[in-house]
Amino acid sequence: MKYLSIIGSTGSIGTQTLDVVSQHPDQFKVVALVAHHNIDLLEKQINEYQPLVAGLVDESAFKELQGRYSGPTKLVGGKEALIAAATIQEATMVVTAIVGAAGIEPTVEAIKKGKTIGLANKETLVAGGPLITSLAKEYGVQILPIDSEHSAIFQWSYSH
């Protein structure tokens, strides 16, 4: 069983990842979900996958979700949501599917916790390539590029 933390769960890669989870419930369990501001979809995902932790990076969206959701999932807001999802003890793999350089810090923190990384954020490798790859080697962490563009960037960064 793989225990997943999905950062960017309401975006294209995040929803596709959750589709795979739904098709293989015997192989995957979602332990954390984080989105930027899509309250409605995140709330639906929380109810369906029942993660231990869920969060919204956008503070006003987070406050609205707090007012709407009263279930057992722990809610986290702001930048702390990214770090909570990246470092949650139960996760064996962290999927980073958020846009831009915002993916660097949670990826670094997940690596430091020994999590396998499913990388769907090319900016993390473009902007933080040497840091990310050296940390992955230091901590013995596997980075799995999620699509062919990321795979090419990943291969390039390891060769330089």
List each model region and its residues.
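Beta-loop-alpha module in the N-terminal Rossmann-like domain of NAD(P)-dependent dehydrogenases
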Residues: G77-A110
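N-terminal Rossmann-like dinucleotide-binding module
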Residues: M1-A54
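Residue-level signal for inorganic ion chemistry
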Residues: T10, I46, V94, G114, ...
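Alpha-helical segments flanking ligand/cofactor-binding loops in enzyme cores
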Residues: E43-N47, I83, V108-E109, S134
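Active-site-proximal loop->helix
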Residues: Q16-Q23, K44-Q45, L125-V141, W156-S159
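Rossmann-fold NAD(P)-binding glycine/threonine-rich loop
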Residues: L65, G100-K113, K122-Q142
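Short acidic-hydrophobic, aromatic-tinged amphipathic segments that line or gate anion-handling sites
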Residues: G55-V57, K74-A81
